């Protein structure tokens, strides 16, 4: 079996602008993102840590690293998924996030699950 199939994690992202927590007059734009992490490989894998690159519309980049997600290090059997919601604040109404989750498979192999870039946008900003 190909290694790419054995160790494979799919990531799906949905975003929302949180108007009630944002203050555009103070350049504070708050977004929530809901991520579904699915083990589409053939071996169990545990999410150990995360690394985010957050970039605003002025190309200001922030790197965020930490253990797990929302206080958890989920162990995903093949076919299982884990969903969580978190958030971030930026100084601009549009930005992007991308990154990686470091995973450890049940056989001890470490691998990164890429989080593809996604856009955070205040409604009616992007056309």
PLM segments and residue spans:
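Intrinsically disordered, low-complexity Pro/Gly/Ser/Thr-rich segments with frequent PxxP/GP/PP motifs
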Residues: 63-94
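Residue-level detector of beta-strand face positions
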Residues: 3, 36, 51-53, 100-102
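Short, solvent-exposed loop/turn segments enriched in Ser/Thr/Gly
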Residues: 29-34, 98
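Low-complexity, acidic Ser/Thr/Pro/Gly-rich terminal tails and inter-domain linkers that flank the onset
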Residues: 1-28
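Short acidic, flexible loop segments centered on an aromatic residue
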Residues: 43-62, 103
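Asparagine-centered strand-capping/turn motif at beta-strand->loop junctions
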Residues: 37-41
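Terminal connector regions
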Residues: 89-127
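A generic structural micro-feature
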Residues: 5, 25-29, 44-46, 75-80, ...
């Amino acid at each position: 079996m190909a290694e790419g199939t054995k160790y494979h994690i799919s990531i799906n992202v949905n975003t929302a602008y949180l108007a009630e927590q944002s203050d555009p007059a103070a350049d504070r734009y708050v977004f929530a993102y809901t991520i579904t992490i699915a083990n589409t490989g053939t071996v169990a894998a545990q999410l150990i840590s995360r690394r985010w690159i957050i970039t605003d519309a002025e190309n200001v980049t922030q790197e965020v690293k930490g253990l797990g997600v929302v206080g958890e290090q989920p162990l995903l059997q093949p076919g299982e998924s884990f969903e969580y919601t978190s958030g971030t604040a930026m100084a601009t109404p549009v930005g992007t996030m991308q990154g990686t989750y470091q995973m450890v498979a049940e056989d001890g192999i470490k691998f990164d699950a890429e989080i593809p870039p996604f856009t955070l946008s205040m409604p009616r900003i992007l056309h």
